[in-house]
Amino acid sequence: MIDRATLEQRVSAQFPTVRIGDESGDLCLTVERQQLPALAGWLRDEPDLAFTFLNQLCGVDYLGRDPRFEVVVHLTSFQNKMRVTLHIEVPEADPTIPTLARLFPTANFQERETYDMFGIIFTGHPGLERILMPEDWLGHPQRKDHPLGYEEVAFTHNEDWIYANKPFAKE
């Protein structure tokens, strides 16, 4: 079993450009997107590290910041009772990042959801397509600049008003 200080030293030695920090007591690594598969694979495959479980992958939109987007990945090593958070900055002009779906099967649907909601493209993904929104949906609804439009839901207390104002043929 390794401790956090040892893990930090090994990450620094193996990946000198990775920025190391702390996030709620967990080790936080900010990695260039091109290095993501190598770092994630190394964390998974090193026998004494064994970060074998990807519990979460999600997107974040920092509208007004450059780079605008970020992908956050949480890995767990049950062997070491330790978590690592990976932060990968993704520019708006080229919102692509290598897939982790081939390394961690749990990344498959989470990458599809991040693509669907934020428009971040996971290159090399085996089936990157919308998972929550209809195929003909325009845009990505979790982006902070996505237009806020909605259709009011009809309930028994307001259905007469809703249906009277709908833009479809009336008798």
From Swiss-Prot:
Q: Which Gene3D superfamilies match?
A: NADH:ubiquinone oxidoreductase, 30kDa subunit (3.30.460.80)
| Record-annotated disulphide pairs | none
Query: Which GO cellular component terms are attached?
Result: plasma membrane
- Can you say where in the cell this protein is located? Cell membrane
- What Pfam families does the database record attribute to this sequence? Complex1_30kDa (PF00329)
How would you classify this enzyme at the top EC level?
translocase
**Membrane topology per record:** Peripheral membrane protein
- Record EC number: 7.1.1.-
- Source superkingdom: Bacteria
Quote the function comment for this protein.
NDH-1 shuttles electrons from NADH, via FMN and iron-sulfur (Fe-S) centers, to quinones in the respiratory chain. The immediate electron acceptor for the enzyme in this species is believed to be ubiquinone. Couples the redox reaction to proton translocation (for every two electrons transferred, four hydrogen ions are translocated across the cytoplasmic membrane), and thus conserves the redox energy in a proton gradient.
What is its quaternary makeup?
NDH-1 is composed of 14 different subunits. Subunits NuoB, C, D, E, F, and G constitute the peripheral sector of the complex.
Spell out the family assignment given in the record's similarity comment: Belongs to the complex I 30 kDa subunit family.
Which NCBIfam families does the record match to this protein?
A: NuoC_fam
Q: What is this protein called?
A: NADH-quinone oxidoreductase subunit C
Q: Tell me the organism.
A: Herpetosiphon aurantiacus (strain ATCC 23779 / DSM 785 / 114-95)
Lineage, opening ranks: Bacteria, Bacillati, Chloroflexota, Chloroflexia, Herpetosiphonales
Q: Could you tell me the gene encoding this protein?
A: nuoC
